[in-house]
């Protein structure tokens, strides 16, 4: 790898994440020459499997599917996999090619995968399909990741580099906690779920121009301009961690109301208001996704190296990589048809007209995913080493107009407002109008990370400990009785059963930690790395799922490698705690074997 490519991939944040994930040693690259062109080719192949370790929590399964949850929009994955069953059996590969001529080069990375469990096995509850899905969310596929050209140069003995093409740019000092300064590239969530996942598999490169130039021997300026917008890849519906309604192509999972209304569906169709009713209820159709535009995403950074500390200042204007959910109320033609069909329904089955009217308003409405544009981010960071040898980093980020998701139950109930006199939901609604799924708020986040190496601990050559804590403040939140943000729909609407908690709070915080022991040459040249990870959301509920009070997770594992070529990894992850934790029944074991060459 050249100096430029190392900058592109192993920035301080990526290095910290590599330590945090227990990244294995680098592969033995194949080096070659074509005349004066120097080339390297890296390859990694692996097989792996993951097993679910808990039965589905009935409180997280909708009532229509035999549970006690107030929504069925997130239970397909729970009902598709039983305790002890594999939810992934995968073969995958990733390859890096770099060609360099002097100070100029090309870097290309590609990956492919085939999940035998998801692709070839029958599912107990609902089939898993690749139709209409993003490539990264499919059960099998292949992708070109990075593909950029670069050039290194010097101006007055001050180094500079430029890159153009699909690439990853990492800023800030965050290691574990999201919503940080490091928000330039979207994430492939599906890739990170796969056993044996590497960091480079889950970061989505985007076409952009990037430049870095030294102004003095201590001051550097960087900047980027993205040539396209891309979105985060979400888990496919029906998979172990998937949500039924969010991924591309998952269009029929937003079900509400009662399936008992099905016999009256032909009556609605006769009045020109057809609706789809399944065993899970009335389907709210999915409207077209409202993707962000390609233009308008850029940022600049200044880095200053003091005697013992590096400081950074950042500004970005970017479009959201993760979607918000909104709804669109049925139009005037639907309202005009209601009196006639309600009268006939009551004649056929006294008292059924009200249920039919609600079902028609729900089934003739829509939901849509929207990616808000022009989010501004201001940030500052530092990185230093304490006298104890502990690496200490930190950052603060401020978004004056960050989108925060409105409670989705209120958005669904807003579809009923035209026939409920506005009493169904606090959202103001008119026929045919959008119920925007977010509001812009001031969001400030402060976080700090400590990393320390302890030599000769418990017989290991080294113990690495990384800890990170963050606090988030959301400004301008309305009174909860007027408008709510966040909380999964499975917990019901505001006030259901007297429950008014679990919504986004003005302040929230939590911390993450990871410890790794390094045992070299334990048996016949095999190196072992036992590791322990811990996550705790201490207080409050963060915007867009960032923190969830009381939620905890612990992961225990061991990584092994032989001659930096053959690898193995085994881990157990347990989710627990918190009154609104939808991961409580998603405990799993992951096992993988790999070879690097």
Where are these regions (language model features)?
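Short loop/turn motifs that connect adjacent beta-strands in outer-membrane beta-barrel proteins
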Residues: 28-41, 54-56, 97-106, 150-163, ...
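Outer membrane beta-barrel
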Residues: 100-251, 510, 539, 547-552, ...
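Solvent-exposed loop segments that connect transmembrane elements
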Residues: 57-78, 119-135, 185-194, 237-286, ...
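Outer-membrane beta-barrel "beta-signal"
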Residues: 585-597
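Transmembrane beta-strands of outer-membrane beta-barrel pores
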Residues: 47-53, 103, 112-116, 166-170, ...
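Membrane-embedded beta-strand positions in outer-membrane beta-barrel channels/transporters
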Residues: 40, 92-96, 146-148, 208, ...
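Short sequence motifs at beta-strands and strand-loop junctions characteristic
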Residues: 85-89, 136-141, 198-203, 290-294, ...
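Detector for outer-membrane/organellar transmembrane beta-barrel domains
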Residues: 86-88, 316-318, 323, 393, ...
